[in-house]
């Protein structure tokens, strides 16, 4: 039987960690990893002078882009920064998936770095049961969850300032 690879993506504060944990527990999947942990490893290997976007948060990575005048809108700029940030993490995510497939182990991976179109899941389709979920919620509910989460983890002040970019 092929292993399951379940990818759960969303903006911060939507509830992907909670859902990922429930999915892993319900399906008896012993491996659950957050892309933030993978990012931390990649940051340790690639310095900020070579990858400044990687060393920012996904929601403010756009502040490191050099050619900001080439973007038609602020939304395009924010998206480009986010994709630049994620592009450093995705190869490592693909290596984690490869290892799980090789070992025939199922895994749930959750995080903001899972970007449809940037992560190449086609390479695993014959080897694993791949399921990719992108979670969304309406803006008012997201903002309420975002504030509650920021207060609970006591490190969300900056994230609240970047709610629009995070969304």
Q: Which residues does each predicted region cover?
A:
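A glycine- and Lys/Arg-enriched "phosphate-lid" helix/loop adjacent to the NTP-binding pocket
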Residues: 126-167
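Loop/turn-to-beta-strand initiation segments
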Residues: 30, 103-109, 129-131
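Glycine-rich phosphate-binding P-loop
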Residues: 6-27
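Conserved nucleotide-sensing/catalytic segment adjacent to the nucleotide-binding pocket
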Residues: 44-105
